[in-house]
């Protein structure tokens, strides 16, 4: 039996009474698991796209058990925050396949969920998570001082190997957040376009009221 912390990124019906869930964990990468009896009321509430959960599964890729890490007010999320969940799950499902035990994706994703659950400004947390997804998938953008200076229009020097300095810089300035978010929209669009992946909605729709 295997145990791991994972994000459920997609849920499909499997035969008459079961579910097929796609998930990502830093320990095992992308996995598809069968949840036998997953459509029952007892089990169905445990498997929701976007939840961060502890999953137990066997070598036959059958899900044996799951437990939520933290509950969130999903029904209180407005359409923009719900689209953030759809968007991030889409990116992870399309771009991440291999395990990466050094990845901070799950930690950054949890930060994003907490910010949205608290109705806080989540734009910086979203940007940092996007950068980590791109890094883990091998498409990390150049974040050298010259690029940051060109994007934000100032004389800044940050550690390109860590997102903490960038995060601190963006949190101090709402205008910088919007500018860098527009930059990320172009970066994501270019990566997906090169891979012939079509984003089902415009990224700007998820930050319209942030």
Residues covered by each model-derived region:
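Non-catalytic alpha-helical scaffolds and adjoining flexible linkers that form interface surfaces
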Residues: 1-19, 24-210
């Amino acid at each position: 039996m295997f145990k791991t912390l994972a994000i459920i990124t997609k849920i499909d019906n499997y035969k008459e009474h079961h579910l097929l869930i796609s998930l990502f964990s830093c320990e095992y990468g992308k996995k598809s698991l069968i949840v036998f009896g997953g459509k029952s009321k007892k089990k169905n509430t445990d498997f929701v796209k976007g939840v961060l959960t502890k999953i137990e599964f066997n070598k036959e890729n059958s899900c044996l058990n799951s437990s939520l890490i933290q509950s969130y007010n999903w029904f209180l999320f407005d359409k923009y925050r719900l689209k953030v969940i759809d968007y991030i799950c889409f990116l992870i499902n399309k771009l991440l396949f291999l395990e990466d035990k050094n990845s901070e994706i799950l930690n950054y994703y949890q930060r994003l969920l907490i910010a949205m659950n608290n109705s806080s400004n989540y734009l910086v947390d979203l940007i940092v998570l996007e950068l980590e997804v791109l890094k883990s998938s091998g498409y990390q953008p150049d974040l050298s001082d010259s690029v940051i200076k060109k994007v934000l229009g100032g004389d800044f020097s940050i550690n390109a190997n860590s997102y903490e300095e960038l995060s601190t810089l963006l949190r101090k300035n709402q205008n910088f957040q919007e500018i860098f978010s527009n930059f990320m929209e172009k970066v994501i669009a270019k990566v997906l376009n090169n891979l012939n992946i079509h984003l089902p909605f415009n990224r700007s729709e998820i930050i319209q009221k942030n």
